Amino acid sequence: AYAEALGVDIDQLILSQPNTGEEGLQIADTLISSGAIDIVVVDSVAVLVPRAEIEGEMGDSHVGLQARLMSQALRKLSGTIAKTKTIAIFINQIREKVGVMFGN
């Protein structure tokens, strides 16, 4: 309803809520490679959690996993994006203070 009020044609909207970062980026790659879409928005990069982190134990160290996942994905996607002329938007969050929302 809100998207429609903003002018989004929801019949043309593809919404995906993947379980892992790898799954989400694979879906983006598949859609971009198909040439059937004009724009893909990943919201948010912060929740593209690597499979190893999801399957690991609480407290395990996963230093750099998300950075490596994004680096690899962007290297792979950049060529496909250029060929298909698809617009790709990646939204992320910056948190300076844990627990603070909306600039408070």
Swiss-Prot record:
InterPro entries: DNA_recomb/repair_RecA (IPR013765), P-loop_NTPase (IPR027417), RecA-like_N (IPR049428), RecA_ATP-bd (IPR020588)
Task performed by this protein: Can catalyze the hydrolysis of ATP in the presence of single-stranded DNA, the ATP-dependent uptake of single-stranded DNA by duplex DNA, and the ATP-dependent hybridization of homologous single-stranded DNAs. It interacts with LexA causing its activation and leading to its autocatalytic cleavage.
Superkingdom, taxonomy of origin: Bacteria
Protein name, per record: Protein RecA
Protein localization: Cytoplasm
Alphabetical list of Pfam families matching this protein: RecA (PF00154)
UniProt source species: Lactobacillus delbrueckii subsp. bulgaricus
Chief location of this protein within or outside the cell: cytoplasm
Family: Belongs to the RecA family.
GO cellular component, one term: cytosol
Alphabetically ordered keywords of this record: ATP-binding, Cytoplasm, DNA damage, DNA recombination, DNA repair, DNA-binding, Nucleotide-binding, SOS response
A biological process term (GO) from this entry: DNA repair
UniProt GO MF annotations: ATP binding; ATP-dependent DNA damage sensor activity; single-stranded DNA binding
